[in-house]
Amino acid sequence: MKKKYPILSLLFFISIGVFSQGNANDKDTSSKKPEPPKDRNMFGLHIPRGLKVNSPDVTDGYVLFAVPNSASFYLVNRRGEVVHEWKGNYAVLGGYLQNDGSIIQNAVDPDFPVFAGGGEAGRIQKISWDSKMQWDFEYANEEYLHHHDFAVMPNGHILAIAWEDKTAQEVVMAGRKPNMIPKAGLWPDKIVEIEPDGARGGKIVWEWHIWDHLIQDYDTKKMNYGKPADHPELLDFNVGDTVPPMISQDSMDVLHKQGRAWRNQTPENEGSEVYHFNAIKYNADLDQIVFSSPNLSEIFIIDHSTTTKEAAGHKGGRSGKGGDFLYRWGNPQNYHHGDSTDEKLFGQHDIRWIEKGKPGEGHLTVFDNDIPNAAHMPYSAVYELSPPVDTKGNYFLEKNGTFGPEKPVWVYMAPDTLSFWGSFVSGAQRMA
């Protein structure tokens, strides 16, 4: 369902949505297909298909989106007509249209092992306008897996989110509480920069691991012991949920047969997927990366101007802070400030900087999916944030020890709240 507003276009598909305003030949190049049903059953809600709003105020351009569980990407015009289709070889999650008409997308590797938790990908591909595979890079094995989202940098490199496997013993040594450690260990997130090489190759030229930026106040004997309230630049390793009681293998088998379990989900890895990074963007002017963790109800900014060695530490780079968080927003409880009334984000997706030349350029927008509502069902909102910076452009803490702002500079939500809700995924982009 797509809704159009004077300064914001919202894509509200159950898929990862991306937008394009590039030039395209306004001609349907897709083959004729049978007419689909008039509505689609989404969680018991029968949502009408097709174009919903097309007002005179619509912004010129096209909309690009992927179809869940298919290998196709579509470009549609503002009349809802298909302009072009790119066809890949695996189920696609999301992607970005390039100036040459190609798509860079992430797709689900058919054989990825170990990991489970939603958003699994494992492959990043470049597909030409005429659907020829130009690059097919696999980042999936028993030690790591690319998932959810990636960003295309101006130099053609790719910044990709990935899980990495840590054994239960490694997690114990990092100071996590025993009741928060699954038998299979944990899968903390990392970010890798990939330089494409040939038709299938890629070189990792930079990387950042959240594992290197943990703090905990549980075990005084561990190297990362400290007070999280004094170090908002680090992540409290004991924030999160305790491990649920382990179910039997028979029960897990039933869940798999019912389609209610992820492909590699086992009784032993329940709770292994902890932070669930689900969106990433790059700002070339700042040389900074922003990413989202709905499990933490926070968005984070880190410095990309570091070397990989500096990114693993607390010094270096343009900021002088290495790979530590430069900024975070959404839930100050995670660094022991405030209470539940200070939580701003609930299962959010699609963090991004507003582009140059558009209202609010340099600000951030985020889609807040699942805002609690005691009187009715949850609802969604889009926030525009202006992170406070000093005269040198450095993010700073407010007097109460938290990162601002206290409130977004702009908010969109439905007047009745109920008519605007995306239970997961979803996104927003400032258009004009």
Question: PLM ranges: what are they?
Answer:
Residues 1-25:
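Bacterial Sec-dependent N-terminal signal peptides
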